[in-house]
Amino acid sequence: MIIKRDYYLQQLISSKSNNLIKIVTGIRRSGKSFLLFNLFHNHLIETGVSEDHIIEIALDDRLNKNLRDPDVILQHIHERIVDDKLYYIILDEVQMIDEFTDVLNSLLHIRNADVYVSGSNSKFLSKDVVTEFR
């Protein structure tokens, strides 16, 4: 059974291109990844966004372990951005990146990027993270 999560999807849609990082938080296995990688991804495709302008990285996937290095993930993302059109960057379990707040701050400097992240542990949910973006 698929739970549509219309309310949360609408929150993401209404926050598109606002020059802020959109953060989806919650306990593990609560549907954050499904919301971003399926529901929001499908919305982007349905509204005309090209697949190659959606950069999705699941950092809890062992195959992406090398991308947990801040320099490696930033280089990977920059290599995928090849034109001036808007790119949607979706990072799942972002707290698995070393120095993830520095990475997120760096992503804010990409003019043609709209950034969405999820996280689920106490390190990511800490109020201290919020102060990093003031």
State each model region's role.
Residues 1-134:
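Phosphate-binding site recognition
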